[in-house]
From Swiss-Prot:
Signal peptide: none annotated. GO terms for molecular function: structural constituent of ribosome. One of its GO terms (biological process) is mitochondrial translation. Transmembrane segments: none annotated. It is found in: Mitochondrion. One of its GO terms (cellular component) is mitochondrial small ribosomal subunit. This is Small ribosomal subunit protein bS16m. NCBIfam families: S16. It comes from the Eukaryota.
Amino acid sequence: MSLSPASGIGRFYAKSAKIIRFVRLGCTNRPFYHIVVMERRKNQHQPVIEQVGSFDPLPNDYNERLVALNTERIRYWLGKGAHLSTPAAELLGIAGLLPIHPRTYMTAWRNRRTAAEAEASPEKAESTA
């Protein structure tokens, strides 16, 4: 019986480029992601080298999005020269493992601007009425 990828026994070529990225699992309208290390050129449905975390993007009853990270193994693979996909880099930046990704700043700026516009639009409607 073979071991699961979470145990870190995946086969790979030593000189090939590695990437830490999300692999989508779950059902329709209910995504769930594994954060995995795999060879860069492989399809996400190919066998992975190692699973280093998981991410549930839909909020639970307490409005929490659950993330589990094996920071020791992530640091190991980054030390070995593994690349990061943009969503994985954003998540690791929010988690405090890396500097915050610039796209995270842009998303926060857009959200603040949209909230300010939504707040200002009822005031304009009241003043014109």
